[in-house]
């Protein structure tokens, strides 16, 4: 299974903790992430992560293309709903593609834990 991991700046620490908590399970899958999120996960765990560009530089769109090409099976996107994002259209497009292609999507830690408990 290929899992995409994305986290806004204020949610990166939550993503690191999530990756640590589920490191054994995640290590059995192919992981892809936006640039900074992937780097931070690799710096804080033993997980290997293929890094795309940073979200604002097109990383969300790269992962969206993977979703559209049936190349990603699940997306964990820890969003910061209280901070405006300059690349909000890219984020909306990614979320829409997950719905269109019926790719499981978690946008907060609690939903991510529920999904990851089942992988």
From Swiss-Prot:
GO terms for molecular function: methylglyoxal synthase activity. It catalyses: dihydroxyacetone phosphate = methylglyoxal + phosphate. Pfam families: MGS. Substrate binds at residues 8, 12, 34-37, 54-55, 87. The keyword Lyase applies. The active site is at 60 (proton donor/acceptor). One of its GO terms (cellular component) is cytosol. It comes from the Bacteria. Its EC number is 4.2.3.3. GO terms for biological process: methylglyoxal biosynthetic process. The keyword Lyase applies. Residues 1-119 form the MGS-like domain. It is an enzyme of class 4 (lyase). Keywords: Lyase. Belongs to the methylglyoxal synthase family. HAMAP family: Methylglyoxal_synth. Catalyzes the formation of methylglyoxal from dihydroxyacetone phosphate. This is Methylglyoxal synthase. It comes from Clostridium perfringens (strain 13 / Type A).
